Amino acid sequence: MHFETVIGLEVHVELKTDSKMFSPSPAHFGAEPNSNTNVIDLAYPGVLPVVNRRAVDWAMRASMALNMDIATNSKFDRKNYFYPDNPKAYQISQFDQPIGENGYIDIEVDGETKRIGITRLHMEEDAGKSTHKDGYSLVDLNRQGTPLIEIVSEPDIRSPKEAYAYLEKLRSIIQYTGVSDCKMEEGSLRCDANISLRPYGQEEFGTKTELKNLNSFNYVRKGLEYEEKRQEEELLNGGTIGQETRRFDESTGKTILMRVKEGSDDYRYFPEPDIVPLYVDEEWKECVRQTIPELPDERKAKYVNDLGLPEYDAHVLTLTKEMSDFFEGAIEKGADVKLTSNWLMGGVNEYLNKNQVELQDTKLTPENLAGMIKLIEDGTMSSKIAKKVFPELAENGGDAKQIMEDKGLVQISDEATLTKFVTEALDNNPQSVEDYKNGKGKAMGFLVGQIMKASKGQANPQKVNQILKQELDKR
């Protein structure tokens, strides 16, 4: 028997507002524990929540960017549960009347475009954070009340690979809107996954399992891959799948049972009596619509149609707004479009991955990268020298030409000096000279390599090729 995988994702995104969802406390990451709190966050008796207008605007902006319908009438509800980092013993959320519904995004997997539906986007407040250490539980309520949006996909995803592509695209769109930085390491983007299997051809869904502790997109994919395999083996062996919540264990790559899954009835939702229903008229919707910036698909089309970049380059460059903005800044400073694209996808990305840093954590700027690329363009700097200059540029900033001179890496373009290197290479490799005369094209490349090696990569490659051909023709 063959099974079809059915996946739905629930993504929590922390909105980048100055204050919290229902209180005036600052909503900033990294503050001293319990320093960004007030009587509303601490649930003192008699205090009343006040809705953050900016958070509503940004929830609407995100909804529109995800092709959703904005509800004219929506409301807030109480989701009741007890936990130490939830002082009210309920969370203010939206249950049956969310702010956004019926959206979608298009993803690309293996060269094919697929549309993934989005059921809803609703607003809610975050809980605090519990830390367990040395037999004690510590509670930090700085995060309590931080504005969140939860984006719930339709069960349209059919593989862990599609889930990964969906998350990448969703993060990209939200980042471009400016409502969140979507940093998983800081908790501003979190994902829970629901997965079930059903026999091919069956319309009814199988029993779903919820996965938690998915702290990176890679862990989402790995957790789903493991769960897909686990459920298939269980079903093939005649077993059944229970509706449960499981935790992904990063060290083993397996999922571990946490608890039997609750239903919505367990939370005893009811309308929030302290907040009036939300009414959004057409004028308000239009005001928000006017604030939506250029989104990744628009930029990608621009890069392909206007700048002549390949589809792949355009896709990679627009995955994050930070990289896309950097690319546009560099070409505005006069850098060649394709060379800039190659460097950002190649040398820059390799440096970021190797050092586990973000672009903003380096000393790179569109100006200094463009300066280096222009030196490569005009022949002042070879690609080999650029690879030696680049790490210094990324770590300390400055001017690429000055770094090249300080390191003694100035490209050799003097004809007499280059002719000497060429002559030595020809004298030391007579067989390659003979091979060249016999029409073996690889011989030329070998000789160029010998010359570059002898010059420690500093010979001007264009002039080397020119002089080498002249000298070979003389022999």
Curated annotation (Swiss-Prot):
Pfam families: GatB_N, GatB_Yqey. It is an enzyme of class 6 (ligase). The keyword Zinc does not apply. One of its GO terms (molecular function) is glutaminyl-tRNA synthase (glutamine-hydrolyzing) activity. Keywords: ATP-binding, Ligase, Nucleotide-binding, Protein biosynthesis. It comes from the Bacteria. GO terms for biological process: glutaminyl-tRNAGln biosynthesis via transamidation; translation. It catalyses: L-glutamyl-tRNA(Gln) + L-glutamine + ATP + H2O = L-glutaminyl-tRNA(Gln) + L-glutamate + ADP + phosphate + H(+); L-aspartyl-tRNA(Asn) + L-glutamine + ATP + H2O = L-asparaginyl-tRNA(Asn) + L-glutamate + ADP + phosphate + 2 H(+). SUPFAM superfamilies: GatB/YqeY motif, Glutamine synthetase/guanido kinase. Transmembrane segments: none annotated. InterPro entries: Asn/Gln-tRNA_amidoTrfase_suB/E (IPR017959), Asn/Gln-tRNA_Trfase_suB/E_cat (IPR006075), Asn/Gln_amidotransferase (IPR018027), Asn/Gln_tRNA_amidoTrase-B-like (IPR003789), GatB (IPR004413), GatB_C_1 (IPR042114), GatB_Yqey_C_2 (IPR023168), Gln-tRNA_amidoTrfase_suB_CS (IPR017958). Heterotrimer of A, B and C subunits. Allows the formation of correctly charged Asn-tRNA(Asn) or Gln-tRNA(Gln) through the transamidation of misacylated Asp-tRNA(Asn) or Glu-tRNA(Gln) in organisms which lack either or both of asparaginyl-tRNA or glutaminyl-tRNA synthetases. The reaction takes place in the presence of glutamine and ATP through an activated phospho-Asp-tRNA(Asn) or phospho-Glu-tRNA(Gln). NCBIfam families: gatB, PRK05477.1-1, PRK05477.1-2, PRK05477.1-4. Belongs to the GatB/GatE family. GatB subfamily. PANTHER family: GLUTAMYL-TRNA GLN AMIDOTRANSFERASE SUBUNIT B MITOCHONDRIAL AND PROKARYOTIC PET112-RELATED, GLUTAMYL-TRNA(GLN) AMIDOTRANSFERASE SUBUNIT B, MITOCHONDRIAL. This is Aspartyl/glutamyl-tRNA(Asn/Gln) amidotransferase subunit B. It comes from Staphylococcus haemolyticus (strain JCSC1435). The lineage of its organism: Bacteria, Bacillati, Bacillota, Bacilli, Bacillales. The gene is gatB.
